[in-house]
């Protein structure tokens, strides 16, 4: 089974080797027929502490690294 890859924005880099990435998804509400935005925060592993707040990144699913962390930052999305 392929590992999921999500795109988001780094919103916190205070922890050592960890960043918090906000991932936003949009979908059409079935009853209201309106586009709804929903966001979720993921803790991701950043081995070299190279990503800062505001960076666009891609995260990939991985084995559990800690209690809350099972994603790895794979690349920086340069706009």
Swiss-Prot record:
GO molecular-function terms, A-Z: rRNA binding; structural constituent of ribosome
Task: List where the protein spans the membrane.
Answer: none
Kindly indicate whether the keyword Ribosomal protein belongs to this entry: yes
Top-rank taxon of the source lineage equals Bacteria
Query: What does the record list as coiled-coil region(s)?
Result: none
Q: Cite the entry's keywords alphabetically.
A: Ribonucleoprotein, Ribosomal protein, RNA-binding, rRNA-binding
Any single GO CC term annotated in Swiss-Prot or TrEMBL for this entry: cytosolic small ribosomal subunit
The GO annotation for biological process reads:
translation
HAMAP family xrefs: Ribosomal_uS17_B (MF_01345_B)
Subunit structure comment from the entry: Part of the 30S ribosomal subunit.
**What is the purpose of this protein?**
One of the primary rRNA binding proteins, it binds specifically to the 5'-end of 16S ribosomal RNA.
Family, as annotated: Belongs to the universal ribosomal protein uS17 family.
The name this protein goes by in its record: Small ribosomal subunit protein uS17
Protein source organism: Bartonella tribocorum (strain CIP 105476 / IBS 506)
């Amino acid at each position: 089974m392929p590992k999921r890859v999500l795109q988001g924005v780094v919103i916190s880099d205070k922890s050592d080797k960890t960043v918090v990435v906000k991932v936003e998804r949009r979908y059409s509400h079935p009853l209201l027929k309106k586009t709804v935005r929903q966001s979720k925060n993921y803790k991701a592993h950043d081995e070299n502490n190279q990503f800062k707040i505001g960076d666009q990144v891609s995260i990939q699913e991985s084995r559990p690294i800690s209690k809350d962390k099972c994603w790895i930052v794979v690349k920086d999305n340069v706009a």
